[in-house]
Amino acid sequence: MSVTVVLGSQWGDEGKGKLVDILSAEVDICAHCAGGSNAGHTIVVPVGPEDLRVPFAPQWCLLNPACTGLIGSGVVVHLPSLFSELDALAAQGLDCTNRLFISDRAHLVFDFHRIVDGLKEVELGGSWYHWDNQKWIGPAYSSKASRSGLRVHHLFDDTFAEKFRKLVEGWFKRYGKFEYDTEGEILRYKVLAERLRPCVIDCVVYIHHAISSGKRVLVEGANALMLDLDFGTYPFVTSSSTSVGGVCTGLGIPPKMIGKPIGVVKAYTTRVGGGPFPTEQLNDVGTHLQEVGREFGTNTGRRRRCGWLDLVVLKYSCMINGFDTLNITKLDILDKLPEIKVGVKYLVDGKELSGFPADLDLLAKVDVEYATLPGWNTSIVDVTSCDALPENCRKYIEYIETFLGVPVEWIGVGPGRNSMLIKEVT
């Protein structure tokens, strides 16, 4: 009677989807607990030639016909985007409408949130980049936090139109009256509500009944720990809880039901947009990681910033999330590097910091102390067992395990779904 959770341990884009793909074959329910369409996933559909991007629908339920998808209470949902996604999947032969449920407590994202997001950026002069990829997430969570937002169950309330107008007027007062068809949007959502109605459930009752009935539940946490609203590099973060705590609050389950939290770790470090990045490499190494690793955003197409693996960040992430095991991804991207560095200490004026600092001004002053490990200078893409990995590759993994005190259970050695090695954990 437990839940398996897959969480990003860095700044996102660690490649959680592949592990979730593998684990989904043996579960009954796959869930999202927080975030929205700012978290992109690319899946290869087994029918049809196109890759599809699925920010909302748990992609594992799409690829496992015996699995049910659940969008939890902590998610903010833009219904037109959700239905557009479902229609695109149906066109590829993956009709999951009857296997996808959404919490009646989930908050709604509207088109005016996009407009407000843009107005906020203009107001700030582009000086403060928040991570939400212009997907309207910040203003939607702002409405939620100010207790003025609308939830899924409000769609079926006779007072929906009145509440919607009041919500829009509130933003008009904040930013001035921008161009927006309020009445047209109300009519559109009346239609969308009827399509949504069969999917709406009480998430708390549903998931507790499922767990008590012995159903196997898999959850992918939103984004990653370093983008968490409380524990990330604030204000360069998203607007929700991306830690293991967000799983509990987003689905309505107690901590004791989480049986196995798994941390996904890219073999190097990347991040999108602005914000501190202590191990960033603005040199040939960074360019190599970016180009060989094809580090471009799923949603935005923007280049990701790249750098060495930061074990200070990972230690911090392990402390907060309590990972049982780790999945290292994209290890093959390091194949051709003669030596590999990992950040092991943050120093300020020669003194080691005891943890990851909250103060970004202090973080900007850190000097990173690196450990240098030998590379393996050979391709591992075709390796099919952990024992067959080059010695220096195994030593790299062992160094990470020893530093963090958490075993590595899965190792990604290539882009394909089958390019994942399973390592025995004792």
Curated annotation (Swiss-Prot):
Pathway noted in the entry: Purine metabolism; AMP biosynthesis via de novo pathway; AMP from IMP: step 1/2
Organism domain of life: Eukaryota
GO cellular component terms, A-Z: cytoplasm
E.C. number: 6.3.4.4
Binding locations of IMP: D13, E14, G15, K16, N38, A39, G40, H41, R147, N223, T238, R302
Catalytic reaction equation(s): IMP + L-aspartate + GTP = N(6)-(1,2-dicarboxyethyl)-AMP + GDP + phosphate + 2 H(+)
Keyword Magnesium: yes
Keywords: Cytoplasm, GTP-binding, Ligase, Magnesium, Metal-binding, Nucleotide-binding, Purine biosynthesis
Protein location: Cytoplasm
Entry binding sites for GTP: 12-18, 40-42, 304, 330-332, 412-414
Binding-site positions, substrate: T298, N299, T300, G301, R302, R303, R304
Family matches, as InterPro entries: Adenylosuccin_syn_GTP-bd, Adenylosuccinate_synth_dom1, Adenylosuccinate_synth_dom2, Adenylosuccinate_synth_dom3, Adenylosuccinate_synthetase, P-loop_NTPase
Active site: D13, H41
EC top class, as a word: ligase
Manner of cofactor binding, per the entry note: Binds 1 Mg(2+) ion per subunit.
GO molecular function, one term: magnesium ion binding
Main location as per UniProt: cytoplasm
Database matches in Pfam families: Adenylsucc_synt
Residues binding Mg(2+): D13, G40
Cofactor(s) listed: Mg(2+)
Family: Belongs to the adenylosuccinate synthetase family.
Functional description taken from the UniProt entry: Plays an important role in the de novo pathway and in the salvage pathway of purine nucleotide biosynthesis. Catalyzes the first committed step in the biosynthesis of AMP from IMP.
NCBIfam families per UniProt: PRK01117.1, purA
Name this protein carries in UniProt: Adenylosuccinate synthetase 2
Species of origin: Laccaria bicolor (strain S238N-H82 / ATCC MYA-4686)
